[in-house]
Amino acid sequence: MARKDAEVLAGVPLFSGLSKRHLRRIASLTEEAVFPAGAAIATEGESGDTFYVITEGRARVRRGARTVARLGVDDFFGEVSLIDGGPRTASVDAQEDVRALSLHRAEFRRMLEREPAVVVRILSELAMRLRQAERPLAG
């Protein structure tokens, strides 16, 4: 199952560019999470320590009462929680039964301590995202 999960993780921008070996290593740390329709997966304002990639089903992303996005298979959320464990910026609810790969921050951090190449790759991805976010501000 780790090989298929590694393929799912390869589609996540935070992990783009990682070797297959590193993707398999991260995949080995994931667990399957199951949420019935209507269940809260993440709650805005609460601390987050888990990253999810949806493998089956659909979910809704809300800020307050307003729906800001809809998620389906291969969509992901909570990646910033892997880095800082800060509060969730939105709520995510299962619109139908959802299955997802989940990766907990503590497991991810332990792996990073043993795999410095992964740290460098992720820092590069985050730096690129920061530059892209700052571009409109500089104009």
Model-derived regions, located:
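Cytosolic regulatory regions built on CNB/CRP/Popeye-like sensor folds
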Residues: 1-139
